[in-house]
Design a protein with these regions (language model features):
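Structural beta-strand segments of beta-rich domains
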Residues: 44-48
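C-terminal partner/receptor-binding element of secreted or periplasmic proteins
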Residues: 97-123
Length: 123
């Protein structure tokens, strides 16, 4: 009986851990002068695998919960990267080119991820 209770508790814990995370795949199109925003409201860290599948370079930035923006990398066409982001951080995918950017993202982590486009701020 103890073994059965332990097994049920273990399975419940595994299901809860699985439900708390989410795997998302997205093929993004980012127009000239725009950036895509992912996240900003997660309660835990999350991971992003990105591959630039388009004709122009993209910039990957991290915006912290305090709105501090840090460059995390630049992806030329065909390049890939895997990055980890802290709880509450947002990933900014900024189009650096004069054509529409394309990028494939695989996101793993908490499922409360905001996704939207916004104009690139003036520097």
């Amino acid at each position: 009986m103890r073994t059965l209770i332990f097994a049920l508790l273990f399975i419940t814990a595994l299901l809860a851990a699985y439900a708390a995370t989410n795997n998302i795949h997205s093929h993004l199109l980012v127009d000239v002068g725009k950036q895509f925003v992912l996240g900003g409201e997660q309660v835990g860290a999350f991971w992003v695998s990105a591959r630039n599948s388009g004709p122009v370079p993209v910039l990957l930035l991290e915006r912290s919960g305090e709105s501090v923006i840090v460059t995390r990398g630049r992806l030329e066409p065909g390049q890939s990267a895997r990055l980890t982001f802290a709880a509450g951080a947002a990933v900014l995918v900024r189009n650096l080119g004069l054509q529409r950017a394309e990028i494939d993202l695989d996101i793993k982590g908490p499922s409360k991820s905001r996704m939207e486009y916004e104009p690139v701020p003036n520097n």
